[in-house]
Amino acid sequence: MDTGGFVDSSSAQTPPPDTSITIMEFSPEGKPTGLRSIDRITDDPSWKSRLSPQSYSVTRRHATDPPFAVAGYDSKEPGIYRCICCGTVLFSSGAKFDSGTGWPSFTSPLAQENIATREDLSYGMRRIEVLCARCDAHMGHLFPDGPPPTGLRYCINMSALDFVPFPKDSVKKDHQE
C-alpha cells in the first residue's frame, strides 16, 4: 500500500476505551520490571485542574507546543519521560536525538505496549498520531524520517511529558557510553 512517504497506518493500534491494557513498567533507572495489566483511564475530570493550561491543551485537546519554546525540549540529561497525565513511562533519553525541529524527538518508545497510534487527517495532512496507551493523551506524531536504527522520528510535545532524571548513582554505572 502506498503511504505517500508516511508510516503505514494499517499497523496503527488504538486500544478500545474502558478496558484494561497491559503496559511495561520500569524502575527509576529505566530498566523494565515487567508487564502489568491496568485499567485504562478514559476520563478524569481532574486533568484540567492538575495540568498546566498548555499541558491540558496539548494532551486533552490535541494542540501542539510552539517549536523551541518549552523548557526541556533540548535537554540531554539522562532519564525517562512519562505521560504528564497518568505517569506511564513512554520514552528514554537513550532514544532521544536532536531533530532540529524544536520538539523532543525519539527513535523509539521504551515499550511499544505503552503507546498507541492512529491515523490523523487533521489540518489537511496525513500523519500518525502518538498517544499514551493508558489515558489516550495526545503526545505528538510519528514520522518516517528519523535516524538509524529505526528510521522513525517520534516528534513529541514537551508539555505532554514529565521528565524524571535517572538517580545520580545509576547514571555513572549504567548510562555511560
What kind of region is each of these model predictions?
Residues 4-45, 172:
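N-terminal pre-domain segments of enzymes
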Residues 26-28, 39-44, 48-82, 88-177:
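A short Gly-Trp-Pro
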